């Protein structure tokens, strides 16, 4: 059924949800479990993102098709047209239709740069803007697809948009073109400034359409760092009144930040609904593949809580399957029959023995999380049925053992998180790219012609004289200052460092440099470094040195652009390098170095060398240099396991012997 028709048929307020295709197979399986739980929130539809230039095409199509066929919720697949061949567009639309998907969100996507721009011009692609894609779908497929488009309450920005002001009035002209071309609904970019959205909504109703479905895009605040990161990527302003609710003393406390963030989103929804007199009745959540904050928002929101209440009324308050306290009757088992989740008040010795354990080399730690095997998890009770909607919502909110297990990855952790998490990877979910415009890239990094020029770029980043490199625009963390000189020396020697951290032992969670998580905790870190190194330098110098020490002291992963991989660890191994111990809480892990995530990042990291090379014409010195690095260098990740010896990793790397 089309989103347009569903919208007009639904009288009461509702939500919709965006997901992105995870980078790993286990992440995808865990995401499907999560999406099944979140259907209890009765979303009108879900959307699945499409990577720039079709970089996630196969994963997007697979996830969207699986969701359409198994969730009983209409799926809307994103489709970007810029830098995407017409054949890919046609194939995607045909596969969507055959899978039962009838809703498409037509987007332009990131504009091509460098060689891609020249190629797109020479090929005379029919798709330069989203309006071209809308028009093409409507002309080629008629009413087979309900087509949505994006809107920008604060105005659209290209890259860093140097020297350009965001202008929503200017963007309204383009939005009107998309609607006139046949767009059936509109979803906005994320925002936190309600006044700017309400102004935009009035303009939209006055100048474009009185009744076209318009969905405000909302992103829950899961951590302070990623709150700012998401706002920066989306060019969304943050009102001072919201910023003031996150004083410095709580910014590293993810639980406190999330709690305040839930309150803020509830207030935004309430204000939008009231001040539009209910014209805005659907709220689109950018989930980041996470569930806890959204379930809490829906349950506590005066506008949306009827969703939860109606679920309880439909199922009957006396159904034991609907009570979270009785979920011991609904164990979750893996395909081998292992009980990995159990909410009984008294855990039996047998169950304790069957729980899975992990270790951090010298210290064995029990992790309270849902671990998915290669065969996946399933919910079972005596009747073989799923838990009730009320129970599923309670789980998504993080209540009980099942809830804690289901939301074990609830804080986005980027590419150094657990690759089993649906949220593993970049927070935008759109694939690898240089997240600045061409002009900004040239301003930041110039035109590198020699390896010495590349060293200078990495060193300037470490010195703070430039705030980004092609792989990261987040800037440096405070703890990097503790190993700044060592990292600079490594780069002088040709070890181009991408990521690193110093070691620490039992540091307070309130520490101004290392601090994170709830109060009164103790934090631990192993030193690690990730870097690009010439293959010959790796094979003749660094690898023999690491092999000499052995994997109990130093472990490593290494790979190159051809897909090669080597390690001194056992297959499918991992190392937790940052963890915290907090009162009345299981051990929390925030940084993990593991084989599967390394391989996924290896491919992305080398693709960024190629993207950087495309900024320069073929066969120019800069283009040749960057392509040679792509071809001749390795990516190496090294972990030092004795976190009490805080200097040993850096001494080993800088030792000339």
Curated annotation (Swiss-Prot):
Q: Which GO terms describe its molecular function?
A: FAD binding; methylenetetrahydrofolate reductase (NAD(P)H) activity; methylenetetrahydrofolate reductase (NADH) activity; methylenetetrahydrofolate reductase (NADPH) activity
Residues involved in FAD binding: 49-50, 78, 108-110, 129-130, 152, 171, 178
Family the UniProt entry places it in: Belongs to the methylenetetrahydrofolate reductase family.
- Binding-site list for NAD(+): 18-23, 49-50
Q: Name positions with the PTM Phosphoserine.
A: 120, 301, 358
Q: What is this protein's record name?
A: Methylenetetrahydrofolate reductase 1
| Organism superkingdom | Eukaryota
Keywords of the record, alphabetical order, are: FAD, Flavoprotein, NADP, Oxidoreductase, Phosphoprotein
Pfam families tied to this protein? MTHFR, MTHFR_C
* EC assignment: 1.5.1.20
- Where in the sequence does UniProt note compositional bias of the Acidic residues kind? 311-321
Pathway it acts in?
Answer: One-carbon metabolism; tetrahydrofolate interconversion
According to its UniProt record, which reaction does this protein catalyse?
Answer: (6S)-5-methyl-5,6,7,8-tetrahydrofolate + NADP(+) = (6R)-5,10-methylene-5,6,7,8-tetrahydrofolate + NADPH + H(+); (6S)-5-methyl-5,6,7,8-tetrahydrofolate + NAD(+) = (6R)-5,10-methylene-5,6,7,8-tetrahydrofolate + NADH + H(+)
- Gene3D superfamilies (UniProt xref): 3.20.20.220
Q: Which cofactor does it need?
A: FAD
Question: Region (Disordered) spans which residues?
Answer: 308-329
The positions flagged as active site in the entry are: 18
Q: Which GO terms describe its biological process?
A: methionine biosynthetic process; tetrahydrofolate interconversion
Q: Which residues bind substrate?
A: 110, 189, 286
Gene that this sequence comes from? MET12
Task: Tell me the InterPro entries matching this sequence.
Answer: FAD-linked_oxidoreductase-like, Fadh2_euk, Mehydrof_redctse-like, MTHFR_C
